[in-house]
């Protein structure tokens, strides 16, 4: 393996997905540093050599090292992979900005939009860091547990810098289990990963109400149409939404109960409140926050997104699930 591709990577974010990506990188033979914001919990990870809170019984590869000091974590690698909830993405960028050098390159696997603005995370990154650093985004149908277990997985990678994209593809890609597809549409890759969480809540609500497979499939299909319309308004490539970061991630998140967003929707459909559902899940439900941002972005762009709008009405305006279903089913007849 060449020195370029065996260069270390620092992963910021020691939740389930950040840990899984760190494991995958280290399993490929790359020195990988995993940082989290709670030193006492990182000390436990370092001692136990696994993340029992999120990925129990999956041992860390030898190449994975825990680093609880952010200054050291940034200094030890030129390539930084951010895997934190979207609502703290900007805060992490502000933390690392004074620690960055000219050689650093920034990638993220965070899926979401900026809180209260609906802006893409690329826009946030460029506003905070400027345009001097190569940026990349990793997105697609990936559940952390399966990735950490080494089960076959495929994902999309998009970057502002073709060399960065090529190098990270070779670094992450594993012929046995982890396939990485390059995509030059950063807007579409980011958008697909963010809005699918909202649609997954809708699919969960539908299933929680007992509406069945037909209704779930209709929601997925029309949800994809909404994502595609919003993407077109922002200049995304329509083909992106038929790929890993679009249809792939949408189907996975809407149909499997490993998805927190789907489980959250299921509980809502069964009559639980948003607060009760989130407490039971016990982890961040990105779609809850992204619903408001997706609705705001759709309003700003003048794009009709009835599924997103109805989920927004339910989560933030007190509309009940039965009225949401009635509103969607009672819409004016139209062509597909």
Curated annotation (Swiss-Prot):
Residue positions of the active site: 196
Binding site for NADPH: 16-17, 37, 111, 144, 260, 284, 286
Claim: Lipid biosynthesis is one of the keywords in the record: yes
Chaperone among keywords: no
Pfam families: NAD_Gly3P_dh_C (PF07479), NAD_Gly3P_dh_N (PF01210)
Pathway: Membrane lipid metabolism; glycerophospholipid metabolism
Residues that coordinate or bind sn-glycerol 3-phosphate: 111, 140, 142, 196, 249, 259-261
EC numbers for this chain: 1.1.1.94
Keywords, alphabetical: Cytoplasm, Lipid biosynthesis, Lipid metabolism, NAD, NADP, Nucleotide-binding, Oxidoreductase, Phospholipid biosynthesis, Phospholipid metabolism
Catalytic activity: sn-glycerol 3-phosphate + NAD(+) = dihydroxyacetone phosphate + NADH + H(+); sn-glycerol 3-phosphate + NADP(+) = dihydroxyacetone phosphate + NADPH + H(+)
GO molecular function, one term: NAD binding
Main location: cytoplasm
Domain of life: Bacteria
Record InterPro entries: 6-PGluconate_DH-like_C_sf, 6PGD_dom2, G3P_DH_NAD-dep, G3P_DH_NAD-dep_C, G3P_DH_NAD-dep_N, NAD(P)-bd_dom_sf
PROSITE patterns, alphabetized: NAD_G3PDH
Location in or out of the cell: Cytoplasm
GO BP annotations listed: carbohydrate metabolic process; glycerol-3-phosphate biosynthetic process; glycerol-3-phosphate catabolic process; glycerophospholipid biosynthetic process
One GO cellular component term noted in the UniProt record for this chain: cytosol
HAMAP family cross-referenced by the UniProt entry: NAD_Glyc3P_dehydrog
Function: Catalyzes the reduction of the glycolytic intermediate dihydroxyacetone phosphate (DHAP) to sn-glycerol 3-phosphate (G3P), the key precursor for phospholipid synthesis.
Family as reported in the entry's similarity comment: Belongs to the NAD-dependent glycerol-3-phosphate dehydrogenase family.
Protein name according to UniProt: Glycerol-3-phosphate dehydrogenase [NAD(P)+]
Native species: Actinobacillus pleuropneumoniae serotype 5b (strain L20)
């Amino acid at each position: 393996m060449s020195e370029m591709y065996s260069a270390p990577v620092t992963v910021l974010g020691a939740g389930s997905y950040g840990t899984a990506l760190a494991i995958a990188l280290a399993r490929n033979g790359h020195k990988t540093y995993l940082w989290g914001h709670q030193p006492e919990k990182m000390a436990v990870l370092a001692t136990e050599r696994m993340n029992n809170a999120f990925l129990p019984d999956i041992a860390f590869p030898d190449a994975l090292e825990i680093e609880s000091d952010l200054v050291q974590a940034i200094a030890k690698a030129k390539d930084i992979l951010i895997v934190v909830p979207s609502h703290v993405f900007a805060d992490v960028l502000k933390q690392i900005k004074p620690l960055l050098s000219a050689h650093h390159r920034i990638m993220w696997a965070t899926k979401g939009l900026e809180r209260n603005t609906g802006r893409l995370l690329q826009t946030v990154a460029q506003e905070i860091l400027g345009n001097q650093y190569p940026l990349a985004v990793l997105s697609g149908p990936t559940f952390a547990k399966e990735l950490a277990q080494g089960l076959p997985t495929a994902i999309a990678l998009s970057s502002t810098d073709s060399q960065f994209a090529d190098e990270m593809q070779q670094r992450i890609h594993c012929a046995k289990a982890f396939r990485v597809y390059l995509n030059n549409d950063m807007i579409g890759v980011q958008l697909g990963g963010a809005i699918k969480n909202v649609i997954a809540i809708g699919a969960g609500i539908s299933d929680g109400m007992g509406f069945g497979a037909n209704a779930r499939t209709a929601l997925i299909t029309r949800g994809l149409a909404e994502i595609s319309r919003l993407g077109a308004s922002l200049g995304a490539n329509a083909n992106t939404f038929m790929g890993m970061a679009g249809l792939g991630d949408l189907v996975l998140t809407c149909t499997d109960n490993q998805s927190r967003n789907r489980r959250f929707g299921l509980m809502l459909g069964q009559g639980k409140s948003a607060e009760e559902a989130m407490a039971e899940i016990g982890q961040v439900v990105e779609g809850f926050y992204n619903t408001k941002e997706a609705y705001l972005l759709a309003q700003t762009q003048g794009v009709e997104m009835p599924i997103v709008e109805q989920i927004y009405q339910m989560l933030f305006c007190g509309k009940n699930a039965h009225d949401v279903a009635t509103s969607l089913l009672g819409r004016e007849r139209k062509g597909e």
